[in-house]
Amino acid sequence: MTTTMNRLPVSTWNPLGVNYAPASAALPAVPAAGWAKAEALSPALPAGVTAPAAADFGSFAASGMGAETDAWLAANANLVNHLAVTGTADAPVVFETALDTDHPHALTYLTIDAAAGSSLTVVQVVRGDAEDGISANLTRIRAAEGAHVVLVQVQLLGNRARRWNAVAIEQGTSARVEQVRIELGGSVVACGARTLLNHNKCEYDLDAVYFGHSNDVLDFNDVSVHTGRDTLCEMHTAGVLTGSADKILRGTVDFQRGAKRGVGHESEDVLLFSPSARNRTAPLILCGEEEVEGQHAASVGRLDENKLYYLRSRGLSEAQARRLMVDARFAPAIDKIPLDSLQDEVRENVARRLNDELDG
């Protein structure tokens, strides 16, 4: 499908090619026979959490991927889940999907309605490497006054699958939403998160990591819109690019009029393992209010040969030294995964990808 996704809120010089996602990241065409049935494990629901048959999110804010992409994802979903939480959930709700020969398509739509003062952690995991596999996800979060929602997304696809991941968030007064986004596989990865901090003292945290290799195309667009007073946003991303991977990250902190004493920080730390890898970063801070604090930072570099030599002189192999450097960058996000076994799986996946690059 041809649509403009991951659009930068304010366009920059067009020849840079960062104003929106490239054509190579376009949404997939709907198969003539329709989408294959998805396979998923039904999650256990802790006390205070229910799964209603329907939810009213029809006029919800757009994700970072854009309203048109959101509409397509919702209309084409072959797995739909709604969660409502009214208390403090004592265990995470875990959604697991797998792409395989019989189930190559997982198009998921999840809504989370967190009532005032409630607390919930949701984990979304997708695995598999079906031929022409498709993983497409739309998650919408409504966090009422004082609610706390943690969304952990872990993507462990193989190299033949493609991935789209949209997140839209609306927050009430003093609400807090934390998002962890780990994207390690897929030949095409396009993600966009957008949160509306339109009430006083609400907070949003994003910790994201990605791994691009071979000819992967990675495209990200993360936006925090501040209209309430005393709002806080922290968006931090770490990535590794190898082979001829091509990555664009747009990170926007938008302070609109009335967002007094708003604070927004965004940063990216990219490690390049190949001279053929292409990295583009478009940090953007928009100020419609004077009394705000906005900061952005981007660090792009290659392996420090002195550090590598030091680690190898202490008995580490080159693969172990590289893994240590990557682990240090990825740890803030991985450590937030509430399941120890999933943390281990993510670290093993990263180590395997690094080893494959060295062997290649």
Segments from the language model and where they lie:
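Conserved beta-strand/loop scaffold segments within soluble protein domains that form the structured core
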Residues: 61-309, 313-316, 330, 334-360
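Polar/charged alpha-helical tracts
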Residues: 6, 47, 71-74
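Active-site regions of enzymes building and remodeling cell-envelope glycoconjugates
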Residues: 32-57
